[in-house]
Regions:
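N-terminal loops that bind phosphate or other acidic moieties
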Residues: 1-130
Length: 130
């Protein structure tokens, strides 16, 4: 099977990140590398540089990594991690956390490239619910 784009879910809540990951695995399958990076190292609400870094490295299977965040400071922490990484194969995407993640995971499962998967996440912002 071809290398698939990885997805990292950065949330202030460990439970939220893992819950969304569980949903994505059901939708896109186990083959898509999806990692959750939620909460702080001591189990509280917040974000962790180390958790994000480890999640990106785990999700990176050679086709690039899409990083999605829930709220403001998660963006700052994820951006810092990406700036510090030697490899530049991961991108931080301004997309809705849940809808963007679902769109990205489904497309990643088809073998689409990082640019296409990123675009799917971004375009999820325009999908109306009602």
């Amino acid at each position: 099977m071809a290398q698939l784009v990885g997805i990292v879910l950065v949330s202030h809540s460990e439970r939220l990140a893992h819950g969304l990951r569980d949903m994505l695995v059901q939708v896109a399958g186990e083959e898509v590398p999806i990692e959750a990076a939620g909460g702080t190292d001591d189990g509280g609400l917040g974000t962790s540089y180390d958790r994000i870094l480890v999640a990106i490295d785990r999700a990176d299977r050679g086709a690039g990594v899409l990083v999605l965040t829930d709220l403001g400071s998660a963006v700052l922490t994820a951006r810092t991690v990406l700036e510090d990484r030697v490899a530049n194969d991961a991108v931080l995407v301004d997309a809705p956390f849940v809808e963007g993640a679902v769109a990205a995971a489904v497309l990643a499962g088809t073998g689409a490239g990082l640019e296409e998967v990123t675009q799917a996440a971004v375009e999820a912002r325009d999908v109306r619910k009602l």
